Amino acid sequence: MTAPPNASPIGPMKVDIKALIAVFLGVALGALDTSIANTALPAISTDLNASAAASVWIVNAYQLAVVAGLFPLAALGDLVGARRVFLWGIAVFTVASLGCALAPDLLWLSLARGVQGLGAAGVMSVNIALIRILYPAARLGRGVGLNAFIVGSSFTLGPSVASLILSVANWPWLFGISVPLGLLALVFGWSTLPNTVPQAHKVDPITAVLSAVCFGTLIYGVGSAAQLSGWPHIVLPLVVAALSGSWLVVRQRGHAVPM
């Protein structure tokens, strides 16, 4: 996914509507899928013969992948260009959505949700960078505000959208509906999103791993505490988060271009 249109300078005079649809649709799908599965957990767990406690991983896997992937993928966007990360992100998200819709058991669904979350992280990590390019400088605040509105409203509407879908279809359609919409965002993005000039610095792989481990274990530990899980599921992840976070801060302080 590297055949781009000509690169555009930051702050074009006109906003490309198809490019905006690609970016905002991708962001909306990523935010929507953060909460869309919550309403359907009882139906999914019954259909897949899974316990209520185990089915929580349908939500957790997605959220962990998003949180763990945001910073490393944003840094990757600086290295290879925001357009490329966005396109690969929406492609992974769309394929994983199909995998979720076809999942025969809880393990498959949870793994597909994790991959879906990584795709969403790719989209969300570079969307502001793309908005900077697509919007004129004088209207950049409007673009950022619209992006925040779409993220917030999509997350809030997730349970309502899920209830609407479940009233006319079964739970796989919660994820299947993202496939055509993801393809639309991919096609529009492929044809309209401009190249960005990659930064000269290199991505530090150790920093990327530390960031993913720190935030992933932090969210896991806090989630386990909220679910009143056993102490090993709470204390150990939080200790790992604290240690990896401390190492991350120390390493970033000496880095020429911190993440």
Predicted regions and their residues:
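Transmembrane-helix bundle of Major Facilitator Superfamily
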Residues: T2-S191
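Hydrophobic transmembrane-helix bundles of small-molecule transporters
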Residues: S167-M259
